[in-house]
Amino acid sequence: MSIRRSVLVAAVLCALSVLCAPQGQADPSGAGGGGCRQGSVMTGRLVPGTGSAGQNIRRAATLRECVSSLLPGIGAGQFSVTIPWNAPGATSAATFAWSDGSVSAATGFGNGLWLITDGPASGHGIQVDVADSWNGWYYSYADVAVTSATFLS
């Protein structure tokens, strides 16, 4: 009986050390390609388009405190995309208009992960992170807070 109790106590202590460890906030300027540490509320509104019922969702958010070797001299940007409503497999074209006047074009599937295809950071992926575990890019036009944007490659 004491072996079982010892194993149980060890398992509980191990789980508690993982669960109680301080949870850090993503730091886009750390390891990797950097990114933007803050974002605004990402707006969403229905517009005529190619999605279900002939509707698209237009989204826009401001990205601030950008620090990355992929964005030299750039401190902020404006993210915008139009996503076909209720069409999760459809690709979308997004733009990042940067504070130095340059523009990056990107493609993605409306899940927050975008591949930059032209302009600054071309060839790299960027994840636009939102406050909740939200999966509403193409299902909902509700506004949602953007917490950061992080380069993944």
What are the language-model segments listed below?
Residues 44-123:
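Predominantly extracellular/secreted and cell-surface proteins with exposed
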Residues 10-11, 55, 143:
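A short, structural micro-pattern
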Residues 120-153:
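Extracellularly exposed regions in secreted/surface proteins, prominently low-complexity, repeat-rich
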Residues 1-26:
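Secretory targeting and sorting signals
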Residues 26-37:
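Cleaved targeting-peptide boundary
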Residues 35-46:
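N-terminal export/targeting and maturation segments
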